[in-house]
């Protein structure tokens, strides 16, 4: 679970909540939680529409890992919790080192469009061999096509990924949306009593 925002309640939202009975507060927080869930999911859809940085075919990372794993988890009379159950999104948020999985020594980073989203061991590119450079201290998976080398993947023991400040929507925008929704809900609740 990602812990990106701890408390999005503005002083105005807190003042609105104080006016309500516990059951009404819980109902209000449930609606604000759903609003927050919608806003975060919309942010992930927007990020997905940007495509990927290398220009390779889309993997729909932001939809698959972000939007599909975001949900309102818990609501009480005092809190509403929206969670994003994705280690990949957590890694985007915090950054860090990516290493190969168990039993693997290297990550294979695609260098060509036809290699993107394909595992080298899948066998979809025939004639692959490892080419090493002692001078550069790196290795590649390549093919020999008509006497010319064609590089498909760069092999590396790890990759350092910087934290992405755009992983989650801007906090000020979320607070403004939640405050507006709280005002709307307060008017609706007051109109019912």
Where are these regions (language model features)?
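Short, Lys/Arg-rich flexible segments
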Residues: 1-193
